[in-house]
Each structure stands twice: as C-alpha cells, then as structure tokens.
Amino acid sequence: MSLRLTRERRPDLLAKASLSREEGNRLLTVESRVYVALLHYPVYDKNGQVVTSAVTNMDIHDIARSGKTYGIRGFYVVTPVKALQKLALKIIEHWQEGYGSQYNITRKEALALARIRDALDDVLIDIERECGEKPRIVATTARPGGNRTSFPELRDMLLKRTQPCLILFGTGWGLTETIISQSDYVLQAIQGPTDYNHLSVRSAAAIVLDRLLGRP
C-alpha cells in the first residue's frame, strides 16, 4: 500500500528511491501495465516508401529479454505476412517448447512475453481485453521535429497512472507518420554526443526501457 500511495502522490520520490529487490518486484508485479510492440508494417524503407520489413531472430530474442528485465507485461511482434508470422512463431516455440526451452531457461522466460499479431489494431484490442481499458500509445522515432515527450515526463506518467501503456518501435527506417499521428505521445529521440543516429531497434528498445522503467 505504501508503494502505491508514494507512486500516486510523490512519484518523484519513488523514482529516486533505493528499493529493495522485493519492493521493486512487488511494484512491477502489481502495477506494471507497460507493453511493447515491434511493428514490421507499416514502416519506411531507406527511400521513404512504406513497406513490410523482415522479421529477425535477434530482434525477437533481444527485445523479449529486455522486456523481461524491465518487467513489461507483453511484447508484440506485428506483421501481416503469414510467412513471417510462421517464422516468428518458430523462433518463439523453439525457446518455449523445443530444445531451447531446456537449453536456456532464462530465454524461455523472456520469450513467454512474445505474442504475434497481424496489425496494431489487433494489439490494441488484445490489451483492452486484458486490462479493461485502452492503452495510451507511445511512438518512438529517431527523426527530429514535432511535439516530443521527454523521458522524465513519460516516466512520471507511468508512475502516476494505472492506464496501460503501449510503446511502439518500428523496424526498417522507422514508424510511418500515419502511425505516429495516431499515437498519444511521441517519445524524444535517443541522442548521443555525436551526429550518428542509427541504433538498431533492439538497442533502442533496451535504452528506452531502461530510461523509463530502470532503477536510478
């Protein structure tokens, strides 16, 4: 109860607090309503054309592992292409039911978060059914400009509110403007000390989750 009240009344203190592992796990177990979706369509290619991108083994593995580390509730792999869905399912089932489930139990735990859906609308319906309300949609992009929500602002919202939150990541050259315009928030771009700005989507996902859900 004290953790819940602190989250509602003084999220700034909770963000700075040194929580025990038990307290942190309890807060995540009871309160976490954060989901991640990796969109393979609609996304841009390098020429700015809207395309469907390929599903990759490493993206599914690494984002699932990051999601498990930071306590998200579900990880969606979104593609309308049945052959790519079949590939994604094969990857997931290898670690859930096949040889991989015995070879690497931690990978099995992480891949248990993964779900495959045709489109973003299917993800939204899924989350609403599971949580009883529609999620706030947070888009990520490396492109500059527009109204952006800072990491501290979004972290504060996650601490204060119980409404589920869906964070979108785009493969290829990123989410389309159509998807971004449908989102409730657009997260500020990750920036380093150089002008180079070409992180892999799995690296970007790990950084975003750490900034939003990681311990100080």
Describe these PLM feature segments.
Residues 173-216:
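Structured adenosyl-cofactor binding patch, chiefly the S-adenosyl-L-methionine
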Residues 73, 135, 164-165, 184:
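Conserved acidic residues
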Residues 4, 65, 178:
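Surface-exposed charge patches
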Residues 139-179, 189:
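Long, charge-patterned amphipathic alpha-helical coiled-coil/hairpin "stalk" segments used as oligomerization
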Residues 51, 90-92, 151-155, 181-184, ...:
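Short, glycine/charged-enriched secondary-structure capping and boundary segments
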Residues 31-142, 206-214:
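RNA substrate-binding interface of SAM-dependent RNA methyltransferases
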Residues 1-35, 41, 214-216:
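SAM-dependent methyltransferases
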